[in-house]
Regions:
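Conserved catalytic cores of very large enzyme subunits
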Residues: 1-107, 128, 134-169
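Contiguous, well-ordered alpha-helical segments that form the cores/surfaces of helical PPI scaffolds
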Residues: 111-124, 146
């Protein structure tokens, strides 16, 4: 990644994903400090929400869009929890011996929910009346992303696993 003229420092990056930014503060809470945990972290997987489609389906209906997005976030969480459980089961039963030896557990791995097509969501939602560069479109995106972040916190509390939000390509 390019750190010049950005708010990132090289020590903040733990992945080669283009936009994955793990909130390493959660790892600090889990013991061993940042240095002791960061090398043993990653993402279980990424489930991406197609925001452009939601904008199309819920044109002009923000409450409907948010309600459907919440349902999709729940489905994404269920999928990631099943994947986490399955991988951990197989690690514990010898299927992934190197992962078991070097990681031991998936406790320091995030479940990632991504969004894409935010500008297209705004354009579809507004029937092309405005886009992300318009204050109305920008404000809509801020509200949507704030809601997704709220849901990440709820999911962390409900599952005990770390969740993060990513802009997926």
């Amino acid at each position: 990644q390019n750190f010049i003229n950005s708010d990132l420092d090289p020590h903040m990056i733990r992945s080669m994903c283009c936009r994955l930014q793990l909130d390493l503060r959660e790892l600090l809470k889990r013991g061993n400090g940042l240095f002791g945990s960061a090398e043993l972290t990653g993402s279980i997987g990424v489930v991406t929400l197609n925001m452009a489609r939601l904008g199309y389906l819920y044109k002009g209906d923000e409450a409907g869009l948010v309600a459907q997005m919440d349902r999709l976030i729940d489905l994404a969480s269920q999928s990631l929890e099943i994947k986490r459980e399955t991988i951990q089961f197989h690690m514990d039963h010898g299927l992934f011996p190197y992962s078991k030896r070097y990681l031991g557990t998936l406790d320091n791995h995030f479940s990632t929910i991504g969004v894409n097509g935010m500008n297209e969501m705004v354009r579809n939602f507004s029937d092309d009346a405005y886009d992300l560069t318009d204050p109305r479109g920008f404000d809509l995106c801020v509200r949507i992303l704030d809601r997704v972040r709220e849901r990440m916190v709820e999911l962390q509390e409900a599952t005990g696993h770390m969740y993060n939000l990513e802009a997926t390509p």
